[in-house]
Amino acid sequence: MKMTQMYMPTLREIPNEAVVESHKLLLRAGMIRNLANGLFAYLPLGLKAFRKVEKIIREEMDAIGCLEFKPPVIVPGEIWQESGRWDSMGPELLRIKNRLNQELVVSPTAEEAFTALLKNELSSYKNYPLLTYQINTKYRDEIRPRYGLMRTREFTMKDAYSFHTNDKSLDEAYLSFEKAYIKIFKRCGLTVIGVKADSGAMGGSGSQEFMVESSVGDDTLLLCPSCGYAANEEKAACAPDKEQGNGNMPQGSALSIEEIDTPNVKTIEDLTAFLKTESSSFIKTLIYRVENSEILGNAENGKKAAKNENKTVLIAVCIRGDLEVNEAKLKSSLKASDAILASDTEVEEATGTIVGFAGPVGLKNIPVIADESVMLMHDAVTGALKKDKHLLHVEPSRDFTPAHVFDLRTVRAGDKCAVCGTALYTKKGNELGHIFKLGYKYTKAMNMTYLDENGKQQHPSMGCYGIGLDRLTASIVEEHHDEDGIIWPMSIAPFQVAIVPIKYEGEMQKEADRLYEECKKRGIEALLDDRKERTGVKFKDMDLIGIPIRLVVGEKNLPNIEFKLRKAVESSLVDKDKVVDLVEKTVKEELAKLN
């Protein structure tokens, strides 16, 4: 390609709306432009890099026997109603109607589409396992798109789905995708961290995310420096604490409950100051509104959960006072679509008192769900279910019995690793890929069945495996850039070599054209800068757009050509008859490093 044929509207100034480096550089390099908030267009150079990412993903999917499909982006709303996600997805799901007043969905993901497409086709155990994928446009009505390609409303995803008749087959597919993802990210030149993760609204289990470190990352990662344990904050676990008392009183010396006056003492901070003791001595009780829980309804011990026709349940969540509830863990533990703090009015209706004085002792209207930390406490302090009153000397199990006990705490830096006991540390990260075992969530909801070897109807299990191509492309720029511009890995670069004559005339033009034609003959992707521009402008543009190799044709250096790697500081002079050999060798070596 010649520069005079290329559309490359580079910018010298950083656009005001750009915050992260990838957004700044992709805009300045003339690779993307935004039409509206969260809606981006790829320009020719950016699209060439994007297509390289797409090609790598296709090659690795094909290598594990995964078959590409092309379902529609707009799908019937009824299949989302069938799966149960029509309501649970919330306002991020873009719902539209056609002229026949039929409900449609602009797909944010494709579990429903693939299940509906294949449910009547995979009717025998002989049809399994089947590995499928799509690379398609998606839409999610994000409340706050930001950071350029990192979080958009319209985006491109590789979604893969596997269908199985047994757990062993699903486990094998999961491992195949895990290995394929590691290859994909390596070939793209990315350093990723595999972390245990929550499946969220997708459902299922056996979940792993592939993250890149980022100062503006959406996720907090908990990492162990000793054993390599890594998890998203939403999923992270830690070693249990020792038994927690008040003043180190031994368990055997438990005292009877005592009610005390605590006028206007509503928060843990207030209580700490009032009682002059540590917050770890308190049992914090929070009232949550839980939606569509699969395990809540009529609670244990004769207590009926406060429930309405919208499948909404009020519960009390108890946790040690110095800890915070992890709402992702809460939703996952209760198999619920959502869990949010109740309103002040709901708290009063459920507990009979105002916010700040709830507690588990004597709570009759709603079930108590406890974090594991609570069951290791004794001689604790809780709200007394009365305004301006608290209880002392509370003993879990003796004074109240939770309906369920789960790991609900938010793990923090300094907590002990659940595997080896070493203190964990945190990093911010962005998710590039996610793999997880869906199980029967969609096949049961949408009644997908097959006949097994005995002629009995069964539901197949599913795996789900996603990669965001736009975020992946932006993440490559985040990891590979300097103050002058992008430094594309050889595997992703729009072109592998840039040929830059000081002036496109005379002997310099002749030699530049010869090098260009020779590169093309050898299958080397070359960009010839044939513009009538100043040398400084040409060099600035080439540094900005990040082509890995630059050949400079100057009259003073002929018959030698200046050879420079974009990632290197120094350049060298190479005989014009040998320089294409060096380019070819370098391209092969750089690609080999990424394989």
Curated annotation (Swiss-Prot):
CDD domains linked: ProRS-INS, ProRS_anticodon_short, ProRS_core_prok
Cell compartment(s), UniProt: Cytoplasm
Chief localisation class: cytoplasm
Alphabetical keyword list: Aminoacyl-tRNA synthetase, ATP-binding, Cytoplasm, Ligase, Nucleotide-binding, Protein biosynthesis
Enzyme class: ligase
An individual GO BP term: prolyl-tRNA aminoacylation
GO cellular component terms, semicolon-separated: cytosol
SUPFAM superfamilies: Class II aaRS ABD-related, Class II aaRS and biotin synthetases, YbaK/ProRS associated domain
Documented EC number(s): 6.1.1.15
Any one GO molecular function term: aminoacyl-tRNA deacylase activity
Residue stretches spanning the membrane: none
Pfam families: HGTP_anticodon, tRNA-synt_2b, tRNA_edit
Reactions it catalyzes: tRNA(Pro) + L-proline + ATP = L-prolyl-tRNA(Pro) + AMP + diphosphate
HAMAP family to which the protein is assigned, alphabetical: Pro_tRNA_synth_type1
Domain remark in the UniProt entry: Consists of three domains: the N-terminal catalytic domain, the editing domain and the C-terminal anticodon-binding domain.
Record text on subunit structure and interactions: Homodimer.
Family in the record: Belongs to the class-II aminoacyl-tRNA synthetase family. ProS type 1 subfamily.
Function: Catalyzes the attachment of proline to tRNA(Pro) in a two-step reaction: proline is first activated by ATP to form Pro-AMP and then transferred to the acceptor end of tRNA(Pro). As ProRS can inadvertently accommodate and process non-cognate amino acids such as alanine and cysteine, to avoid such errors it has two additional distinct editing activities against alanine. One activity is designated as 'pretransfer' editing and involves the tRNA(Pro)-independent hydrolysis of activated Ala-AMP.
Protein known as: Proline--tRNA ligase
Organism expressing this protein natively: Treponema denticola (strain ATCC 35405 / DSM 14222 / CIP 103919 / JCM 8153 / KCTC 15104)
